[in-house]
Amino acid sequence: MSIKYVFLISRQAKLRLAKWYSTLSPKDKQKTVKEVGQIVLQRKPKQCNFIEHRDTKVVYRKYASLYFIAGIDLDDNELLVLEIIHRYVEVLDRAFGNVCELDLIFNFQKAYFVLDEMVCAGELLEPSKPTVLRCLAQMDETEAAENADRGWADINLEGVAKTAMLTVQEFKQSFSR
């Protein structure tokens, strides 16, 4: 099985995450995201989650307001890719506690890290949720130690938001504008 790309788009067709496992020019990548995104967003919920686009089979699944999309070879197993997507979402749910679009916007590095732990060069590398979560916990510990060394350990979004008289969500939204 060879995954060519994985990307996440919102209902508004905004790209939230993109990982490419095959070589394409930036123009071709942008064209693929636009075309596949439009096709997927126009499909009805009861329609099949597999479509063919050029020389690729597109497998997608919607979770809340996000579409998780993967492009694979035409002869690859679509159900296996759906399971990989589901496993990825399960790990993100455990990592973020019911993952949402804002989690992916503000913690995109974790989303990429989890994907990199699970898929390498387009092949499923680590299917075990506990193993991926353990690696993520180690990364968080390392990051916390590095931040403590820099004096950033005590930065608290809630405290900053209260000082500005905003909710944490309003505070996060002010950065997305």
Feature locations, PLM:
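Intrinsically disordered, Ser/Thr-rich regulatory regions of eukaryotic membrane-trafficking proteins
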Residues: 1-177
